[in-house]
From Swiss-Prot:
Family the UniProt entry places it in: Belongs to the elongation factor P family.
Domain of life, per lineage: Bacteria
GO process annotations (BP): peptide biosynthetic process
Keywords: Cytoplasm, Elongation factor, Protein biosynthesis
Pathway(s) this gene product operates in, as recorded in its UniProt entry: Protein biosynthesis; polypeptide chain elongation
Main subcellular location of this protein, as a coarse class: cytoplasm
Function (record text): Involved in peptide bond synthesis. Stimulates efficient translation and peptide-bond synthesis on native or reconstituted 70S ribosomes in vitro. Probably functions indirectly by altering the affinity of the ribosome for aminoacyl-tRNA, thus increasing their reactivity as acceptors for peptidyl transferase.
Organism: Tropheryma whipplei (strain Twist)
HAMAP family for the chain: EF_P (MF_00141)
Protein name, entry field: Elongation factor P
An example molecular function term from Gene Ontology annotations: translation elongation factor activity
Annotated InterPro entries: Elong-fact-P_C (IPR015365), NA-bd_OB-fold (IPR012340), Rib_uL2_dom2 (IPR014722), Transl_elong_fac_P/YeiP (IPR020599), Transl_elong_KOW-like (IPR013185), Transl_elong_P/YeiP_cen (IPR001059), Transl_elong_P/YeiP_CS (IPR013852), Transl_elongation_fac_P (IPR011768)
Length: 185
């Protein structure tokens, strides 16, 4: 058992038999009353995000989650296949386990897979990835005084807004947390 002072971003808590990862936390010491910890938790299995408050010093159950360096190989009909770089085992994850990370997975993409009791839980992507633009309309600056954007389809099939000067084949850097264009690669 651990206490609420051990809660940090990314820590996995076992609450009522469900694994939840801490997205945000805040230690609050009000002028009146006792201190408490306000958290935002994401259920690993369902993806549901909930707010939960713990009294300061309360006991919580921290779960050991192993992080494996992996490479994305391919997608078949019902799963995504990754290769563990330590022992070259193949790991299969369902679409719900991969979730929105599927928008940024290209062949041989390096990722981290979180596992609990040797069962894969979810995919952790790097903060940004480099992807190629496969389709976009030609951009026309025309009479704009400020830069504009246009839709572009990436090699993964994901569509984002990019500046007008981006053309088909351009490799761009995309923020995996927001899905926004960062810059040319």
């Amino acid at each position: 058992m651990a206490s609420t002072s051990d809660i940090r971003n990314g820590v996995v808590l076992n609450i009522n038999g469900q694994l939840n990862t801490v997205i945000e936390f805040q230690h609050v010491k009000p002028g009146k009353g006792g201190a408490f910890v306000r958290t935002k938790l994401k259920n690993i299995l369902t993806g549901k995000v909930v707010d939960k408050t713990f009294n300061a010093g309360a006991s919580v159950v921290l779960e050991n989650v192993d992080r494996r360096d992996c490479t994305y190989l391919y997608r078949d009909a019902d799963s995504f296949v990754f290769m563990d770089l330590a022992d070259y085992d193949q790991i299969r994850l369902t679409a719900s386990q991969v979730a929105s990370a599927a928008n940024y997975l290209s062949d041989n993409q390096k990722v981290v897979i979180a596992t609990h009791n040797n069962a894969p839980l979810y995919v952790d992507l790097p903060p940004s990835v480099v992807l190629a633009v496969t389709h976009t309309e030609p951009g026309v600056q025309a009479d704009r005084s400020t830069g504009g954007t246009k839709p572009a389809t990436l090699e993964t099939g994901y569509q984002i807004q990019v500046p007008l000067f981006i053309t088909v084949g351009t490799r761009i850097r995309v923020d995996t947390r927001t899905g926004a264009y960062i810059g040319k690669a």
